[in-house]
Amino acid sequence: MLKKKIPYITAILPAAGTGKRMKSLLPKQYCTIGDKTLIEHSMNALLCQSCIRHCIVVINARDHWFRQLSISYDPRVSVVVGGHTRADSVMAGLQHVKKSVWVIVHDAVRPCLHHEDLLRLFEITKFSQVGGILAIPICNTIKRTYCGTNFIRYTVNRENLWHALTPQLFNYDLLKYCLKKALKNRVTVTDEASALEYCGYKSIVIHGRSDNIKVTHQNDLKLANFYLSKLYKKT
């Protein structure tokens, strides 16, 4: 069988969040671990791959932090202004993609991405016409409560349930079409894969790692610091 080459890819990092859940005046993507911000760690994990030739960072209109970072001057990096939701911001990024068949979307506050996981995502997804995502099987017991209460209604069957992560890698034209349709119809999409699902397309799930965490609350910073220290020792 002939090997199929990994195509050139454009990366999009939605980074228009304002840090409300962190209860901080500083948006969480600019919190630091070591000598780098979370967004720099996340971008570096992507930009070290030769197949990623362009990285579009989508920021808030009032963001004055990103351009203070040295990585913002990397010739591969472009900056655009995002919207009110993640989907709006990703769509804003898609409008600035140039001549790329594939687009990879990664959370700006998910700094602990392993090189091996990224390569596995590339290797498996390149044979797909749609795309795929990193995810991990749900291992904890999941409870559903009655609406508006904290009373347990039932236990959710964990079989075939996965916790979606990023990066998520998709065919550019297909992602743009599906996201545009979802936004037009005011469908809530919490990640890129859900836009594809809405339009009836089947994405691939690629087994990721539980340490690929999204930093949402203050306590997550300590955990990310621990995971990153282990990751850098390994490399």
Swiss-Prot record:
UniProt keyword terms in alphabetical order: Isoprene biosynthesis, Nucleotidyltransferase, Transferase
SUPFAM superfamilies: Nucleotide-diphospho-sugar transferases
Reaction catalysis annotation: 2-C-methyl-D-erythritol 4-phosphate + CTP + H(+) = 4-CDP-2-C-methyl-D-erythritol + diphosphate
EC number: 2.7.7.60
Residues in coiled coil: none
One biological process term in Gene Ontology: isopentenyl diphosphate biosynthetic process, methylerythritol 4-phosphate pathway
GO MF, one example: 2-C-methyl-D-erythritol 4-phosphate cytidylyltransferase activity
Pathway connected to this protein: Isoprenoid biosynthesis; isopentenyl diphosphate biosynthesis via DXP pathway; isopentenyl diphosphate from 1-deoxy-D-xylulose 5-phosphate: step 2/6
Residues flagged as site, Transition state stabilizer: 21, 28
InterPro entries: IspD, IspD/TarI, IspD/TarI_cytidylyltransf_bact, ISPD_synthase_CS, Nucleotide-diphossugar_trans
Lineage top rank: taxon: Bacteria
Biological role stated in the UniProt entry: Catalyzes the formation of 4-diphosphocytidyl-2-C-methyl-D-erythritol from CTP and 2-C-methyl-D-erythritol 4-phosphate (MEP).
Similarity-based family: Belongs to the IspD/TarI cytidylyltransferase family. IspD subfamily.
Quaternary context: Homodimer.
PANTHER family reported in the protein's UniProt record: 2-C-METHYL-D-ERYTHRITOL 4-PHOSPHATE CYTIDYLYLTRANSFERASE, CHLOROPLASTIC
Protein name: 2-C-methyl-D-erythritol 4-phosphate cytidylyltransferase
